[in-house]
């Protein structure tokens, strides 16, 4: 029989997800019901994503918020516009503060993104459209691009 030494586990560096939640959700279906009859062609999807990081009052606690907006259009209609602010509260335990920016910009968003993606998929489907399946996002590439833009 093995036992787990919790003292050692508590000293190990790790990220704890304390909460996940929808902060804001809006879906517009402005041309319904006419737009629902025009679903025989693939719409153009415009997608934007932003990450906001807030240092909370408790030490090493942060809120990481994904802001996702998507608009679908065809040649005749604006089919839908969806906005989602989805956030998580993270505790960075026994992690050097120099590593916090990359963890908060890459690893934490990657942890909550699948949940935000599912919400968007479900909402667009419930609005009468094919579910919007957002491709996986390389948060590491976004972080490095943003860092190189700040250096220039």
UniProtKB/Swiss-Prot annotation:
It is found in: Cytoplasm. GO terms for molecular function: unfolded protein binding. One of its GO terms (biological process) is protein tetramerization. The keyword Transmembrane helix does not apply. Its main location: cytoplasm. PANTHER family: PROTEIN-EXPORT PROTEIN SECB, PTHR36918. This is Protein-export protein SecB. The lineage of its organism: Bacteria, Pseudomonadati, Pseudomonadota, Alphaproteobacteria, Rickettsiales.
């Amino acid at each position: 029989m093995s036992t787990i030494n919790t003292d050692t586990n508590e000293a190990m560096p790790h990220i704890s997800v304390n909460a996940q939640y929808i902060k804001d959700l809006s879906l517009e279906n402005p041309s319904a019901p006419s737009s629902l009859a025009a679903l025989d062609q693939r719409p153009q999807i415009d997608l934007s994503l932003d990450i906001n990081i807030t240092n909370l009052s408790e030490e090493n606690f942060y809120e990481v918020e994904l802001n996702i907006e998507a608009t679908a259009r065809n040649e005749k209609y604006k089919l839908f516009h969806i906005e989602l602010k989805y956030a998580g509260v993270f505790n960075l335990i026994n992690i050097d503060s120099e590593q916090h920016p990359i963890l908060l910009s890459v690893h934490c968003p990657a942890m909550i993104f699948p949940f935000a993606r599912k919400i968007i998929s479900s909402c667009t489907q419930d609005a009468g459209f094919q579910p919007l399946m957002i491709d996986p996002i390389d948060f590491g590439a976004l972080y490095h691009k943003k860092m190189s833009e700040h250096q220039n």
